[in-house]
Amino acid sequence: MEAETSTQEVVKQVKNLPILMEDAPVGSDDHQLQYSYTFSYFMRPTGKFDPEDYASYVQPVGIMKSVEQFWSIMVHFKRPTEMCDKADIHFFKTGVKPVWEDPANCKGGKWIIRLKKGLSTRIWENLLMAIIGEQFLVGDELCGAVCSIRNQEDIISLWNRNADDTPVTNRIRETLRSVLQLPQNTVLEYKRHDDCLRDQSSYRHTTKNICK
């Protein structure tokens, strides 16, 4: 019996949590977005948690295809500065999961901005408006953004598809500085998602200003 148990294969299954807000058609007077986006969030479950199970706990909130739908969903979220618990808020192109292993993310990486508590709401909202307004001018290269609420700081990251495309990755960094009006001495860190997979961490062992 013991031998049978020891060789038993355990298969992890992602819990496909139902979306909280139904997908709605774009109204005739709405301002349609170039891409469809999905809001979702993750809150760490109580007790023991395996990072490999992250995707199982991502709760989709709603899909937006227009500016009007974007704001109709935004009003249902607490602002990052109002959140106390450790959580991640995701804003990704529809069909792209907010995990390193997703085909759109696995060869990419992310620019990371660390913020003192109390500053994340303005930066986060400005970043989302820049994304839906296509201010980055890199098309499919952007995958999405994450706002991570932590005890000592908040962290905002912008994910791109191809970490090896230095000119585009560089352009994303400079556009981030511009649209968020960051001081020139603000440190932006970069981390490839294959490195995240190796060390099972999103924000440790980053590289500062990797693209010179």
Curated annotation (Swiss-Prot):
PROSITE patterns the UniProt entry points to: IF4E
Pfam families, alphabetized: IF4E
InterPro entries: TIF_eIF4e-like, TIF_eIF_4E, TIF_eIF_4E_CS
GO MF annotation terms: RNA 7-methylguanosine cap binding; translation initiation factor activity
GO biological process: regulation of translation; translational initiation
Any one of the GO CC terms: eukaryotic translation initiation factor 4F complex
Disulfide bonds: C143-C147
Entry comment describing in which tissues the protein is expressed: Enriched in somatic cells.
The UniProt record lists the keyword Protease: no
Keywords of this entry: Disulfide bond, Initiation factor, Protein biosynthesis, RNA-binding, Translation regulation
PANTHER family hit by this protein: EUKARYOTIC TRANSLATION INITIATION FACTOR 4E HOMOLOGOUS PROTEIN, ISOFORM B (PTHR11960:SF18), EUKARYOTIC TRANSLATION INITIATION FACTOR 4E RELATED (PTHR11960)
Miscellaneous comment: Completely dispensible; null mutations have no effect on worm.
Family: Belongs to the eukaryotic initiation factor 4E family.
Function: Recognizes and binds the 7-methylguanosine-containing mRNA cap during an early step in the initiation of protein synthesis and facilitates ribosome binding by inducing the unwinding of the mRNAs secondary structures. All 5 eIF4E proteins bind monomethyl cap structures. Only ife-1, ife-2 and ife-5 bind trimethyl cap structures which result from trans-splicing. Translation of trimethyl cap structure mRNAs may be regulated by intracellular redox state; disulfide bonds change the width and depth of the cap-binding cavity determining selectivity to mRNA caps.
Subunit structure: eIF4F is a multi-subunit complex, the composition of which varies with external and internal environmental conditions. It is composed of at least eIF4A, eIF4E and eIF4G. eIF4E is also known to interact with other partners.
Name of the protein: Eukaryotic translation initiation factor 4E-4
